[in-house]
Amino acid sequence: MLRLPTVFRQMRPVSRVLAPHLTRAYAKDVKFGADARALMLRGVDLLADAVAVTMGPKGRTVIIEQSWGSPKVTKDGVTVAKSIDLKDKYKNIGAKLVQDVANNTNEEAGDGTTTATVLARSIAKEGFEKISKGANPVEIRRGVMLAVDAVIAELKKQSKPVTTPEEIAQVATISANGDKEIGNIISDAMKKVGRKGVITVKDGKTLNDELEIIEGMKFDRGYISPYFINTSKGQKCEFQDAYVLLSEKKISSVQSIVPALEIANAHRKPLVIIAEDVDGEALSTLVLNRLKVGLQVVAVKAPGFGDNRKNQLKDMAIATGGAVFGEEGLTLNLEDVQPHDLGKVGEVIVTKDDAMLLEGKGDKAQIEKRIQEIIEQLDVTTSEYEKEKLNERLAKLSDGVAVLKVGGTSDVEVNEKKDRVTDALNATRAAAEEGIVLGGGCALLRCIPALDSLTPANEDQKIGIEIIKRTLKIPAMTIAKNAGVEGSLIVEKIMQSSSEVGYDAMVGDFVNMVGKGIIDPTKVVRTALLDAAGVASLLTTAEVVVTEIPKEEKDPGMGAMGGMGGGMGGGMF
């Protein structure tokens, strides 16, 4: 049996090089009270100042350096907010919290990020000021949230539903910083594909903006062989009233497709084969029969990869009323194909790059059921890539897709415009959901009287309500300031005017806001205020901030350099 001293002697110190998990992590820096809040507020101010310059029709652009490519020029609040990363850890914490406000508003409403940022700054700033004078931060937060609930209820009362394409165009124009062309093109797109239809934004190839409406199921796979071309008008293959054979597997054997060809021939209908691939004997036989006998057939590779391909093929089967061969869990063999296994479409157009199936003859109830399945998946998924793919599939099964192609003279111009188009698109969707209120910050100003009827439980809650009263004036003041006029005077004049009057910063005059088309989606204004108040009032309750102290890296190269210099010197003489 070992005695205690012997045990101690046998224990060896473990090298930290050999066991890096035993090394100490970064040391922490802790700041308390007013010092921590003051530093965080400077970060909030820096970010909010950078974002606020973009607000309103006379707002300026922000140029952001990028690690690759040319600098980005934008007027999009959330893009500016995301680009800011401060060196000082405490300032950065303040900036990041307001960045979260902009991100949340962008994800929920798709617009209003600049409004959310300036509101958050105002609430945080006023909150810090009152707390430093001895107010209770928890009660202030309660007062703030009480006031916000009252404002949201008042916004819902003010809200009017969007009914006409003109109103949709007005919402889009305001969100795109007064660009009427963008407003009109978005209104046209919504007219064509419906308010719930899918509208995508892409880079255009020309100087002008273009709108393309894609009806039916279009996917980016063309014919496998150019020998399938059957028309002299362009390099494409066109069929009317055709059968569709869908296969998840590769088709190489000619025996497997003969039954489908015989069915198509017996019914005197063309056949479209969509499979993982068609090659070898099967492809050469199809091409030979196409050229020699005039067989009406075209082979196309299935779109997508993995699960996405399976889902798209299943969508096609439901839309055309057919079945997918080679699908897991089903024992369907290509050799046993029956007429009811083939999909039916009114028209097919296949080019070298893409294929389009129009007027699918699928069961309407089955299509509707599939659409509902995709909508449910959309609600659950958090991945942006998944959402994009699900939206594409949804569009193909419903009213089709509108593609907005944004034109311009350079990449920088196109990217700046694309940001505005995306914002405008999100704003119109939000307007269709919850209706519209007065724009230019007026809707929030008109909610101030509703706060007078609130009864706070104590003096600190009353301070919270007063903070929101002053904060509601900030968006209108910022828009006026960016237009080069005194914000507080403008706000005072709006408050004294009748309820539908506001300030048009573009022309510098007081106008009937609805009549002039200066309107905002209710959802955007509501989300901006709710997100700003939630995060900023929580920020004011902070008493301690903990950050990491970065380790100072020693430069390993300097000693070697000195020695090298000495050696070189010796060699020279």
Swiss-Prot record:
Identification of the protein by name: 60 kDa heat shock protein, mitochondrial
Organism encoding this protein: Pongo abelii
Gene: HSPD1
Residues bearing the modification Phosphoserine: 67, 70, 410, 488
Range annotated as the organelle transit peptide: 1-26
Catalytic activity of the protein: ATP + H2O + a folded polypeptide = ADP + phosphate + an unfolded polypeptide
Family, per entry: Belongs to the chaperonin (HSP60) family.
PANTHER family documented for this protein: 60 KDA HEAT SHOCK PROTEIN, MITOCHONDRIAL (PTHR45633)
BP GO annotations: protein refolding; response to cold
InterPro entries with a match to the protein in the record: Chaperonin_Cpn60_CS (IPR018370), Cpn60/GroEL (IPR001844), Cpn60/GroEL/TCP-1 (IPR002423), GroEL-like_apical_dom_sf (IPR027409), GROEL-like_equatorial_sf (IPR027413), TCP-1-like_intermed_sf (IPR027410)
One GO MF term: ATP-dependent protein folding chaperone
PROSITE patterns: CHAPERONINS_CPN60
Residue(s) carrying N6-malonyllysine: 133
Subcellular location: Mitochondrion matrix
GO cellular component assignments: cytoplasm; mitochondrial matrix; protein-containing complex
Main location: mitochondrion
Cystine connections: none
Annotated binding of ATP, by residue: 75, 111-115, 440, 520
